[in-house]
């Protein structure tokens, strides 16, 4: 699992007025909660961009002037019009205890259905899994080679050692859809058999 270090400054003032003042200075108000006490702090918005605007998932190391806390992003709030990050909630990670995190999905292989004209569609870009920090991969690699036209891979079909899926088992991960070209190829194949 990838790690990212962010410098965090503890907040001394709280409330809407203090949060707006922090945003004007290029800082983003944040909370850290979980086991232990809740901590309110600010992080530089430019540093936070490397975490927010990427498909990757990270274990974040929050550096409070030498004291490091490990965490994952739980929730991010954006401004409704501008793409400005307003607030981030972090959840504390403790070594030896499982953590739930959304991991990106990467498809590998060339599906059989695509070879005859079907179209591969990725339905879920990220899946929520639960596992120990040392067992978490950077991404979930799904082999689509055996997929035929009209077939779907569901979360319940996937198995990764040391990971438990939090995303419901009935959630579709990817599918090979029927296209006009594949329908035409199937019809031609049927006529050839007669």
Where do the protein language model's features map onto the residues?
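Acidic, negatively charged sequence tracts
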Residues: 1-194
């Amino acid at each position: 699992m990838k790690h990212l270090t962010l410098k965090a400054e503890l907040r001394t003032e709280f409330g809407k007025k203090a949060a707006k003042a922090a945003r004007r200075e290029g800082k983003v108000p944040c909370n850290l909660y979980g086991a232990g006490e809740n901590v309110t702090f600010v992080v530089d918005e430019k540093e936070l961009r490397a975490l927010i605007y990427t498909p990757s998932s990270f274990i974040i190391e929050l550096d409070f002037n030498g004291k490091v806390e490990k965490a994952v992003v739980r929730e991010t709030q954006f401004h409704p019009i501008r793409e400005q990050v307003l607030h981030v909630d972090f959840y504390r990670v403790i070594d030896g205890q499982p953590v739930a995190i959304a991991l990106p999905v990467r498809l590998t292989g060339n599906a059989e259905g695509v070879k005859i004209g079907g179209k591969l569609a990725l339905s879920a870009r990220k899946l929520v899994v639960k596992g120990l920090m040392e067992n978490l991969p950077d991404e979930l690699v799904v082999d689509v080679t055996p997929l035929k036209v009209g077939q779907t891979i569901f979360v319940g079909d996937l198995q990764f050692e040391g990971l438990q899926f939090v995303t419901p088992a009935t959630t579709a991960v990817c599918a090979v859809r029927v296209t006009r070209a594949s329908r035409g190829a199937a019809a031609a194949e049927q006529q050839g058999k007669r």
